[in-house]
């Protein structure tokens, strides 16, 4: 994908706090189910903002940095998801979301970002992303020194 959307750590916190506002009142939730790995950071932020202490993971592998591949469920939580926020960083093609809906039909599936192909599969999200755009997450990047333009 030629187009990129960069999310900084500050943006991730801001977007996830906006998502938390959509999930009030906090007392309705038994816990948070983070989709590993993309949902881990948003889950920590949601846990803080909603004062939720019970956090579990569902581990689904479908990407190698910037390439989608076959989906594998590595670890799953028991139950149908009732009373749980299921959080991932992004809904893209919707393949992971479909799997999560099958596994946890009573959970509230939310993402920080959503692309058009998967948007109808989530209950809440914050940022619209064009389908042809790759998202660079803060945990995949580092701040580095760049020479001034005049030195090139």
Curated annotation (Swiss-Prot):
Topology in membrane: Peripheral membrane protein
Top EC class for this record: transferase
EC number: 2.4.2.-, 2.4.2.22
GO biological process: GMP salvage; IMP salvage; purine ribonucleoside salvage; XMP salvage
Residues given in the record as Mg(2+) binding sites: 89
Entry binding sites for xanthine: 92, 135
This protein's UniProt keywords: Cell inner membrane, Cell membrane, Glycosyltransferase, Magnesium, Membrane, Metal-binding, Purine salvage, Transferase
InterPro entries in UniProt: PRibTrfase_dom (IPR000836), PRTase-like (IPR029057), Xanthine_Guanine_PRibTrfase (IPR023747)
Reactions performed catalytically: GMP + diphosphate = guanine + 5-phospho-alpha-D-ribose 1-diphosphate; XMP + diphosphate = xanthine + 5-phospho-alpha-D-ribose 1-diphosphate; IMP + diphosphate = hypoxanthine + 5-phospho-alpha-D-ribose 1-diphosphate
CDD domains reported in the protein's UniProt record: PRTases_typeI (cd06223)
The protein's annotated pathway: Purine metabolism; GMP biosynthesis via salvage pathway; GMP from guanine: step 1/1; Purine metabolism; XMP biosynthesis via salvage pathway; XMP from xanthine: step 1/1
The UniProt record lists the keyword Calcium: no
Subcellular location: Cell inner membrane
Residues annotated for guanine binding in this entry: 92, 135
Main location: membrane
The protein's required cofactors: Mg(2+)
Binding-site positions, 5-phospho-alpha-D-ribose 1-diphosphate: 37-38, 69, 88-96
Subunit structure: Homotetramer.
Function: Purine salvage pathway enzyme that catalyzes the transfer of the ribosyl-5-phosphate group from 5-phospho-alpha-D-ribose 1-diphosphate (PRPP) to the N9 position of the 6-oxopurines guanine and xanthine to form the corresponding ribonucleotides GMP (guanosine 5'-monophosphate) and XMP (xanthosine 5'-monophosphate), with the release of PPi. To a lesser extent, also acts on hypoxanthine.
Family: Belongs to the purine/pyrimidine phosphoribosyltransferase family. XGPT subfamily.
Record-given protein name: Xanthine-guanine phosphoribosyltransferase
Gene that produces this protein: gpt
């Amino acid at each position: 994908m030629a187009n990129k959307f960069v999310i900084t750590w500050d943006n991730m916190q801001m977007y996830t706090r906006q998502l938390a506002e959509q999930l009030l009142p906090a007392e309705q939730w038994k816990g948070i189910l983070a989709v590993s790995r993309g949902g881990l950071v948003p889950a920590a932020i949601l846990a803080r903002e909603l004062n939720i202490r019970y956090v579990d993971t569902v581990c689904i592998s479908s990407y190698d940095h910037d390439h989608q591949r076959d989906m594998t469920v590595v670890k799953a939580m028991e139950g149908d998801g009732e009373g749980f926020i299921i959080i991932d960083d992004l809904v893209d093609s919707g393949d992971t979301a479909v799997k999560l809906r099958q596994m946890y039909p009573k959970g509230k599936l939310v993402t920080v970002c959503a692309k058009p192909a998967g948007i109808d599969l989530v209950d809440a999200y914050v940022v619209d992303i064009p389908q042809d755009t790759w998202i660079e997450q803060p945990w995949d990047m580092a701040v580095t020194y760049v020479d001034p333009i005049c030195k090139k």
